[in-house]
């Protein structure tokens, strides 16, 4: 039986599912299997009935929602009129990527797996549940699952006689060729594709809006341990509109110092211009890269040299290495037996791609430029809750950004790429423009004017609730109850004066929790319990909606536990009934969360 074309379809929000899908494509080609890799919504879903072998790679977002680039597919595949034999010719497998700190961990992958079985598909394997919370990340589940997958696939569809697997030490052809230009082209100028003011289409990832930064203000006290910024952008003429709960995506860049260091280590001329040419006819050039492009632009705006490399990075780097000792170490890091050592070298200290290349200088200096886009992942956009309403701040968009910085055993502090880049931008020193676009968030607020809302937002989790409060107050909705948690009243009490003014106007009831101002720490869940009778009255008798945003570590579980206690003490419910009551709130979208790790 001839080997079929393997189809890998992905639904990806942050890029991880796409990375895993491309890894699947590489491993398939190494095993002499033809392979196509596509986003689910770019694939004509009606053709699925003709596909013999499909791997689905799906992330789960928000409250168990599918990623944006598989929502059309999701609606189609769950149509009730699809026959139960629609996919009876298909062998399939589903690989899920999620975060076990969320209640609906890998919900999309689990639900899709069940649906494909209902439609007659044959599962090659149980669904894979990759977990961001694992110390090795999703690879802890993905690696053994992929080994089993290839055993099953090759057992069903062995390669033609005489065609052996391409050995791991031999690099596959690069996805692109870089055609270097001897001189600058006479027409056109380098720059990313952007949405221009007055454009018919709203800004998107392929065409972001270059928003002028109006202000970049630190809102934590000078002695506070964390630098938190309130940043405002001008979106006049962008075509951007948003509502409370929506998020803005920002495309960050690498620092000039890191770009210079990268070019030095790899022996690249940052001003060298090139044209990017795909090797395969069905592969298109990245829309974010101009043609022609300079090496400086590629490294500054596209290659994520500040990310922690995955195992696949070491696999390809070992293939490209010409230095015996360095190659030996890279092969060890990329082997199954070397994963513990790789974790200690790379994952635990959060060592970056740039730092790894500096540790392997002979290998780095010999990397063919054609392989840069295969070796280094693309810089992914970062999502921030919008912290303002267009009804209060017309043509403006504000975000609250906690600058990520922490120490590991490495001498240099670890810094978040996007938050550090944003914090470094100073509109007072000259014009600053930031590529951004907006998408719907996971929080949806009630449209009925008399429905109260309870919002629990410790730290920067308060950002979407500021947008909601501004929007609701502008619409005359006064039933706003905000539980805000921070450490110190005089250090990180964001928008204190604004909240107090709204309280004076009877537009807001503010319940703060200052965790460090007394010997016994007080958190938002403690204030909820203190005001349990009010919370029960609002939820049970007034039909209030309850919202929670912030760090996913333990706060969501603590708040849920506080609610369960309130339901039992104030509502007289037994424990199972309290759990059922909470579940009903979640099912009817009267209890919504937006948390992050």
UniProtKB/Swiss-Prot annotation:
Binding residue positions for FMN: 12-17, 59-62, 97-106, 132
EC number from the UniProt entry: 1.18.1.-
Reactions catalysed: 2 oxidized [2Fe-2S]-[protein] + NADPH = 2 reduced [2Fe-2S]-[protein] + NADP(+) + H(+)
Pfam families in alphabetical order: FAD_binding_1 (PF00667), Flavodoxin_1 (PF00258), NAD_binding_1 (PF00175)
Main subcellular localisation: cytoplasm
One of the GO biological process terms: electron transport chain
Molecular function terms, GO-annotated: electron transfer activity; FAD binding; flavin adenine dinucleotide binding; FMN binding; NADP binding; NADPH binding; NADPH-hemoprotein reductase activity; NADPH-iron-sulfur [2Fe-2S] protein oxidoreductase activity
Keyword Oxidoreductase in record: yes
pH-activity note: Optimum pH is about 8.0.
Keywords in alphabetical order: Cytoplasm, FAD, Flavoprotein, FMN, NADP, Oxidoreductase
Spans annotated as Disordered: 188-207
Cofactor: FAD; FMN
Domain of life, per lineage: Eukaryota
Cellular component per GO, a single term: nucleoplasm
Binding positions for NADP(+) per the UniProt entry: 460, 515-516, 521-525, 558
Tissue: Low expression in brain, heart, kidney, pancreas, prostate and skeletal muscle. Highest levels in the placenta.
InterPro entries associated with the record: CysJ-like_FAD-binding, FAD-bd_FR_type, Flavdoxin-like, Flavodoxin/NO_synth, Flavoprot_Pyr_Nucl_cyt_Rdtase, Flavoprotein-like_sf, FNR_nucleotide-bd, NADPH_Cyt_P450_Rdtase_alpha
Domain Flavodoxin-like per the UniProt entry, residue ranges: 6-150
Homology family: Belongs to the NADPH-dependent diflavin oxidoreductase NDOR1 family. In the N-terminal section; belongs to the flavodoxin family.
General function of this protein: NADPH-dependent reductase which is a central component of the cytosolic iron-sulfur (Fe-S) protein assembly (CIA) machinery. Transfers electrons from NADPH via its FAD and FMN prosthetic groups to the [2Fe-2S] cluster of CIAPIN1, another key component of the CIA machinery. In turn, this reduced cluster provides electrons for assembly of cytosolic iron-sulfur cluster proteins. It can also reduce the [2Fe-2S] cluster of CISD1 and activate this protein implicated in Fe/S cluster repair. In vitro can fully activate methionine synthase/MTR in the presence of soluble cytochrome b5/CYB5A.
Quaternary structure, from the entry: Interacts with CIAPIN1; as part of the cytosolic iron-sulfur (Fe-S) protein assembly (CIA) machinery. Interacts with DCPS.
Protein name: NADPH-dependent diflavin oxidoreductase 1
Originating species: Homo sapiens (Human)
Gene name for this UniProt entry: NDOR1
